[in-house]
Amino acid sequence: MLNDRARILLKTLVERYISEGEPVGSRTLSKHAGLDLSPASIRNIMSDLEEMGFVASPHTSAGRVPTPRGYRFFVDTLLTVRPLDQVSVNHLENSLAASDPQRLMTAASTLLSDLSQFAGLVMTPRRNPAFRQIEFLTLSDKRVLLIIVTMEGEVENRVIVTEQSYSAAALTEAANYFNQNFAGHSFDHVRSKLRDELGRMRDDITRLMAAAVDAGTQALDASQDNVVVSGSRKLLDVEELSSNMRSLRRLFDAFEKKTGLLQLLDQSRSAAGVQIFIGGESELLPLDECSLVTAPYSVDGVVVGTLGVVGPTRMAYERVVPIVDVTAKILSSALSQHK
């Protein structure tokens, strides 16, 4: 698509713009590109790049800036990623030593933000939706506590408001039935199987089990997915983002609600390594003026979540990419040791 001279000039323009934040003119390109070209030849090539949509000319400047298409070509074809310096690697390894998983998620998010100086994101691991054991306890006349032990050994509680009171024996009978027949399965699986079973059971037990399935599903779904966000306020220091308060509000709203971020990070789980979304590629409106660099992390080789950095499209990709990549690998190692 582009000849060698055009590639070198585009690479130089993107690197200078990322470094300086100002539109890049032909004189700067002539100085830094290392090509024996006249200013007129450089202007002609830049005009061609503009026609192809790789660069654009701001109205207030004679220089040019990269477009999202220009950034994409740069990232896919021209980017030279630098290894993460050993000081940063050591800091990551020391900070992400085997620990409680939730603490590791928070630490990883903070480290991503500190090292990149942008916002760090970590999608918490997908929990196994199955349960190991359940138990019913009477709270009052028509209130029953459902206790769920997950396959990871974590405990979730939900209060069920019943239409009638239940004896301790009835609650034990219902719990035993659940545990003997469905331990190791999800509540969705239980729901599908119970359709056939409930017709052979007493109505009072039927109602209790149906209520337990609904409550259990809600309990595990509520704690299923989350995104830990750190350092979002650092984006206030990015001029091209802070100058548009409307876009900035949308971005911070996305950080708070997290639903769109979850969907985007979830899509990245299947990526083989680092993935970069530039501007509108994320299809998430609040990120239209941002780039998102993500990588999946795993436990014993099984992908369980995604982490990443959100920053401006004018970010130092050659530095952010290894930060995200190395953090994902070190977090994977720490989680595998902790399990």
UniProtKB/Swiss-Prot annotation:
Instruction: Return the Pfam families for the record.
Output: HrcA
Q: What keywords does the record list, in alphabetical order?
A: Repressor, Stress response, Transcription, Transcription regulation
Entry's Gene Ontology molecular function annotations: DNA binding
Tell me, which GO biological process terms does this entry list? negative regulation of DNA-templated transcription
Q: Which InterPro entries match?
A: GAF-like_dom_sf (IPR029016), HrcA (IPR002571), HrcA_C (IPR021153), WH-like_DNA-bd_sf (IPR036388), WH_DNA-bd_sf (IPR036390)
Q: Gene3D superfamilies of this UniProt entry?
A: 3.30.450.40, Winged helix-like DNA-binding domain superfamily/Winged helix DNA-binding domain (1.10.10.10)
The protein's matches in HAMAP family, at most eight in alphabetical order, are given as: HrcA
Entry's family note: Belongs to the HrcA family.
The entry's function note states:
Negative regulator of class I heat shock genes (grpE-dnaK-dnaJ and groELS operons). Prevents heat-shock induction of these operons.
Q: What is this protein called?
A: Heat-inducible transcription repressor HrcA
Native organism is Thiobacillus denitrificans (strain ATCC 25259 / T1)
